[in-house]
Amino acid sequence: MPIKLLMPALSPTMTEGNLARWLKKEGDKINPGEVIAEIETDKATMEVEAVDEGTLAKIIIPQGSQNVPVNSLIAVLIEEGEELSGIEEFIAKNNSNSPKKEEISKPAETIAPQNVKEENITTASDQNNIKVFASPLAKRLAKIQNVRIEEIKGSGPHGRIIKQDVLSHKGGSKALSNKIVSRNPEEYRLAPNNNIRKIIAKRLLESKQTVPHFYLSIECNVDKLLDIREDINKSFGDDKSAKISVNDFIILAVAKALQEVPNANASWGDDAIRYYNNVDISVAVAIENGLVTPIIRNADQKNIVDLSSEMKGLIKKARENKLTPEEFQGGGFTISNLGMYGIKNFNAIINPPQSCIMGVGSSSKRAIVKNDQISIATIMDVTLSADHRVVDGAVGAEFLAAFKRFIESPALMLLYTR
């Protein structure tokens, strides 16, 4: 008997998703555990594994389809030796939960305005109503070149004018070379927004419109941190996979500071403020389609080596679109680090419903005054963005002071555990 493949629910709140890509085609043999498709939710693109064994007999929902309801019939498997003759009847009987064709968006297409192949023939008319057959690109080049296109003889099928005809037209090549070298005929390209980009836009717009942000900045001397990091990494020898990053120390310092200042580990609710009992830290990670924030849970209870290893694993999964909902949903505080891009400081946008996000800038050598003497130190800028409904200025300042103490004296946070 044919086996139904249904649109899976990849999180408790998921009601629909996009079928981004089929990794198998009709006629392919499927084994349990094989990845057969990629489903795009409002948070991430996730792989779907087969549960049953069989042959992919019919793909019902094509790749690129959007807004496919959960539990819709997306494909059908048949068992070994089973005939295809009754497959259409089976689909007709079992496709009642599937969305109607008009309810599912067509696969997203890449739109490139004015970037039309020369084979696409269009008809143009001049002021004297003389019909001219030319490709859109040829017409645009003729306009840039300031040449009357009806004066150009076409060499394409049925006498149509193509790009090369415009380029080789007498008096045209020189003018064109002077004008088009520094300007692309296609003014722009359009990239359809995927679900990840849409949800980022929605949440950040909501944050800036509804959350009263305020910002606190501080400078941290990271010379001791860099020294102790170097000593730790030397102990790993040539094992680069075990190396501790500056960001690992930042995560641990934030965790210890939240342990000391729990009022910064909170979120706003209309009826009550939630003060979190666990220190779960979201870390912003750039991916091809946008941004995700995997979570280090109970970060205050972990040593620097374990925390670093866990963070590396989460980053790898994030960039491979393999994070599970439990690994990126929740969290009480976010860290966004742009220091590796040379950004000195920035004001990050709060990730609702959290009340705080800390933007970390680059480290650089600067002159400082110490004991009335000018000396050189490695300084890192950090900026706390906080929700003033939850975090008062004094609480934000207290948190940054605790963070600064841990980051400037890293031995404290390496020893300071519950």
Curated annotation (Swiss-Prot):
The keyword Transferase applies. Gene3D superfamilies: 2.40.50.100, Chloramphenicol acetyltransferase-like domain, E3-binding domain. The active site is at H388. Binds 1 lipoyl cofactor covalently. GO terms for cellular component: pyruvate dehydrogenase complex. The modification N6-lipoyllysine is found at K43. InterPro entries: 2-oxoA_DH_lipoyl-BS, 2-oxoacid_DH_actylTfrase, Biotin_lipoyl, CAT-like_dom_sf, E2/Pdx1, E3-bd_dom_sf, LAT1, PSBD. Belongs to the 2-oxoacid dehydrogenase family. This is Dihydrolipoyllysine-residue acetyltransferase component of pyruvate dehydrogenase complex. It comes from Rickettsia bellii (strain RML369-C).
